Amino acid sequence: MMTNIWHTAPVSALSGEITICGDKSMSHRALLLAALAEGQTEIRGFLACADCLATRQALRALGVDIQREKEIVTIRGVGFLGLQPPKAPLNMQNSGTSMRLLAGILAAQRFESVLCGDESLEKRPMQRIITPLVQMGAKIVSHSNFTAPLHISGRPLTGIDYALPLPSAQLKSCLILAGLLADGTTRLHTCGISRDHTERMLPLFGGALEIKKEQIIVTGGQKLHGCVLDIVGDLSAAAFFMVAALIAPRAEVVIRNVGINPTRAAIITLLQKMGGRIELHHQRFWGAEPVADIVVYHSKLRGITVAPEWIANAIDELPIFFIAAACAEGTTFVGNLSELRVKESDRLAAMAQNLQTLGVACDVGADFIHIYGRSDRQFLPARVNSFGDHRIAMSLAVAGVRAAGELLIDDGAVAAVSMPQFRDFAAAIGMNVGEKDAKNCHD
C-alpha cells in the first residue's frame, strides 16, 4: 500500500556538485561473480539499493558469506558448485537483474530452488532466459506465460550455440554465467548493442571469454579468483540530475565519478543532440570501466527523432529523457519501445499519462511516442503517479524544477529500489523534494 507522497517545488536556479552512487548493474554482477570465485573479493562503491540488496540476500541464503564494513563489501567466494540449497524460495523483490542472472547460475547447481518476486516482477517476461537455459539442459518450471515464480531443478549444463533474439544485457549475462558453469563451449550471437559490464568484469576475476563481432564465446570449466573492485558511478542515476540541470534556469551542476561506458552513454549523446551543454572532464579508467566528471549547464533544448539503434542503449533513461523532451522546442519522436512496456511498469503508458496530467501534449502508439515540447514549458501543478516504478518517481521529481507550482508524486519513496539517496543528491544541487504521509494529502 502506498503510504507516502513526495512533493516538489520549482526552483530559480540549480548549482553544486555530487558524487553519484555506485552503478547498479555492476553491483549485481560484482556480487554474483565474487560468489562464484574462489577466495575473497572486496567491493568498493557497492550500491546498497533495494535491487542489489535482493541479490545480496539471495546469495546469503545460498551459503555465501557477505559482510559490509563502512564502504567495503567483502565476499568469501564458494566456487562454481559451492552454493548451498536454500531453505525457502529466493525473493528477488522488484529486481529483474537478480532473477535473470541468478537463474543462469542456479540452473547448473545440484539442488532445487525457487525464484520469486513482487507483483511487478512476477509479471515480467522470463521466456527469454528459460528457452536457452532449457536448451543447455536446465529444468525450469515457470508460471503461466513464462513468468515467475521459477522452479529450478539444478543439473549439469552443456554449452550451446545460441542467437540472442533481442539486445538484452540481462539475457546475455545470464547465458555467460550459465556458460561458465556448463560443459563445453557456449557461443552467443548478439543482435545490437547492450551493456557489457559482465564482459568487462569477468577478466578481473581471472575469467576468459572471446569477443568477436556480434559473437561471445565462453568456455566452461574455468576457475575464478577473488579480486578488489571499484564500482563506478551510475550513469542511469546521474541522468536525472543531468536533465534537472538542463531544464532548470541558471543551472550548473557537476556530477563526479560517473561511468561513461559506451554501451551505456546513449543518454549523453541524445541530450547533446537536443542541444544540451554536457561536458566530460577528467576522463580516466577505473579497472575496465571508463569514468568522467560530468558538468551540465542549463540549455535551450530542441526536439529530435531518436533512431531505433539508440533505444536498447538508453532504455533505462527513457523516462527522464521524456521529461527533457517535454521542455525542448518542437516534437520529439521515439519508436521501437515495445521493451519499455515490460519494465517495472508499462513505462510508455505510465509516462504518457503523467505527461498529459502535467499539461504536455503527446501521442502514444503500441511502441512509439510523439512528445510536443515547448522551450518555455511550465508543468502544471498536479498529483502524479509513480506506478510503483522507481525511475518514473525520480523523473517526475525532476519535472518539479520546471513546474508552475507544487507536484505531488504518489509513492515517491519507491526510488529506493535503485537510488535511496535521491533526495539527498537533489537537495545538494538545490532541488526541492520533500516527503509527507499520504493520509495528509488530498487531491
From Swiss-Prot:
One of its GO terms (biological process) is chorismate biosynthetic process. It comes from the Bacteria. It is an enzyme of class 2 (transferase). Its EC number is 2.5.1.19. The keyword Amino-acid biosynthesis applies. Belongs to the EPSP synthase family. This is 3-phosphoshikimate 1-carboxyvinyltransferase. The gene is aroA.
